[in-house]
Amino acid sequence: MTRILLLLLTFYRYFISPLLGGNNCRFYPTCSKYAKEALNTHGGIKGLWLIFKRIIKCQPLCDGGYDPVPPTK
């Protein structure tokens, strides 16, 4: 499952994101880099949950800033 999600993420980063204006993320690391790290660190299920929470925060009412992937416990 994780490999498929990483493949979809790669497709998004190289083909869809440039059409949307490229790097406009208000966070560091960018949301797509965060997603890749979350999937590699936590696997598919928890990684998807972390990605979902990050995307919800990525909106005009949030200042953004440094938001790393939490470490595994």
Curated annotation (Swiss-Prot):
Subcellular location: Cell inner membrane
Coiled-coil ranges from the UniProt annotation: none
Pfam families, A to Z: YidD
SMART domains per UniProt: Haemolytic
Keyword Membrane: yes
InterPro entries assigned to the protein according to its UniProt record, in alphabetical order: Membr_insert_effic_factor_YidD (IPR002696)
Keywords from the UniProt entry: Cell inner membrane, Cell membrane, Membrane
Topology in the lipid bilayer: Peripheral membrane protein
One Gene Ontology cellular component annotation held by this UniProt entry: plasma membrane
HAMAP family given in the database record: UPF0161_YidD (MF_00386)
Function: Could be involved in insertion of integral membrane proteins into the membrane.
Record-stated family: Belongs to the UPF0161 family.
Cross-referenced PANTHER family: MEMBRANE PROTEIN INSERTION EFFICIENCY FACTOR-RELATED
Protein name (Swiss-Prot/TrEMBL): Putative membrane protein insertion efficiency factor
Species the sequence originates in: Rickettsia bellii (strain OSU 85-389)
